[in-house]
Amino acid sequence: MTSQPLRVGIGGPVGSGKTALTLALCRELRERYNLAVVTNDIYTQEDAQFLVRNEALAPERIIGVETGGCPHTAIREDASINLEAVDQLNRRFPGLELILVESGGDNLSATFSPELSDLTLYVIDVSAGDKIPRKGGPGICKSDLLVINKIDLAPLVGASLEVMDEDARRMRGDKPFVFSNQKTGQGLAEIIAFIERQGLLTAA
């Protein structure tokens, strides 16, 4: 039986840094794994085009899904459009090891269907204020890894990383989280280590 690729869902609100994280992961992992990406946008393929422009992967390894309406539905209640994209990539690239599925920007209640994602990363950003972790919601409380992004902006918006740390621990219990800054690469190594460890990936 052919083994199925690990599917990693990357969710979070609009502008939190999901696409920047997806790009960084592609650049770091494309030499190690047989890798592809599915992106979700409501009415365009902007995120997919951004990844292609920045040469994250070969264009044929990136599929942009236009969800229409609510992006939450396309990753949860009716994930068929995304599942079809995953199947298409599996057919196109036999031996695929890893597929990153980036959701469209959504609210704190968004979660991935277990049919679509084996591991979930949820990205929030400091610029939205240090109260975000304590607001809870499935993404913050139940994702496999919470990524608190854009920590360089904390002084500019008056956000306390200490408060965010305390609240994330309280809301998530034993579930891990990481502070990151995609501009400098801070936190990226921890995110990759988490994906490899939890997804049982072994680099070629």
UniProtKB/Swiss-Prot annotation:
CDD domains for this protein: UreG
Annotated GTP binding lies at: G12, P13, V14, G15, S16, G17, K18, T19
Give the keywords, sorted: Chaperone, Cytoplasm, GTP-binding, Nickel insertion, Nucleotide-binding
Among the entry's GO cellular component annotations, what is one? cytoplasm
Location in the cell reads: Cytoplasm
Signal peptide segment:
none
Instruction: Mark the transmembrane ranges.
Output: none
Please tell me whether the keyword GTP-binding is annotated for this protein.
yes
Q: Which domain of life is it from?
A: Bacteria
Instruction: Give the Gene Ontology MF terms in alphabetical order.
Output: ATP hydrolysis activity; GTP binding; GTPase activity; nickel cation binding
GO BP of this protein: urea catabolic process
Q: How does it assemble?
A: Homodimer. UreD, UreF and UreG form a complex that acts as a GTP-hydrolysis-dependent molecular chaperone, activating the urease apoprotein by helping to assemble the nickel containing metallocenter of UreC. The UreE protein probably delivers the nickel.
- Role this protein plays: Facilitates the functional incorporation of the urease nickel metallocenter. This process requires GTP hydrolysis, probably effectuated by UreG.
Q: What family is this?
A: Belongs to the SIMIBI class G3E GTPase family. UreG subfamily.
The molecule here is called: Urease accessory protein UreG
Give the species. Answer: Pseudomonas paraeruginosa (strain DSM 24068 / PA7) (Pseudomonas aeruginosa (strain PA7))
Gene that encodes it: ureG
